[in-house]
Structure formats: C-alpha cells, structure tokens
A protein has these predicted regions:
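Short, well-formed alpha-helical segments that are part of the catalytic scaffolds
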Residues: 14-31
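Glycine-rich, basic loop-to-helix element that forms the pyrophosphate-binding segment
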Residues: 60-77
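The conserved acidic donor/metal-binding loop of glycosyltransferases
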Residues: 86-90
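Conserved donor NDP-sugar-binding/catalytic core segment of glycosyltransferases
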Residues: 93-106
Length: 106
C-alpha cells in the first residue's frame, strides 16, 4: 500500500470550506499527497493547513470555478494517481484500500 500512497495525490477544491476540510484531511492517508486549491484567498487557512498536515500543498487561487481549479490541482500533481474530492468527503478506514484494489484491476 505504501507504493500506492506515495504515487497518489488527492486534489480538493475549497471555497470557504474551513468548517469541513479538517475532517476530510484527517480521514485521508497521512502518507498520500494532498493539494488544496483554496478559492477564497484565505491565507490563514493555508498557513494553518500547511502547519498541521504532512504532504500538503495549499494553492491560493483566484476563484476560477470548480473545474478550472481541479485542473490546476491536477497539473500541480506529480503522481501517477490523482483523486478529486470535495472538502466534505470523509474516508472510511478501508476506502483507500478499496480504491487501490480497483485501480489494480483496471
């Protein structure tokens, strides 16, 4: 599983999502890369997330919309696998294992 974690990035687009993003990030595998595209120019959120979570990059972005922001996050990713999440997603303990099993079977 570590090989998959190191080759995985979760891209999350946020706009005034500080009430839910922490719960989302706390359920993701700590070793996986995370790119947060913050569309509300919240510099305090950027600083706080980058100080509390490993393997995270927070991009402060002009609000160009959901699709364009996801594309920006994907372009910034340097991994083989990229998953796009909404900031209110909460992974269960077996979610990532199920995702990797599905990827291997394709």
């Amino acid at each position: 599983m570590d090989l998959y974690l190191k080759n995985t990035t979760f891209v999350i687009v946020c706009f005034k999502s500080q009430e839910v993003i922490y719960d989302c990030l706390n359920t993701l595998p700590k070793e996986a890369n995370k790119i947060i595209v913050e569309n509300s120019n919240n510099l305090n959120l950027k600083k706080d997330l980058e100080s509390k979570f490993n393997n995270i990059e927070v991009i402060i972005n002009e609000n160009t919309g959901f699709g364009a922001s996801n594309n920006l996050g994907i372009k910034k990713s340097k991994t083989q696998f990229v998953f796009i999440l909404n900031p209110d997603v909460k992974f269960r303990e077996d979610t990532f294992d199920n995702l990797t099993k599905t990827c291997r079977s394709i």
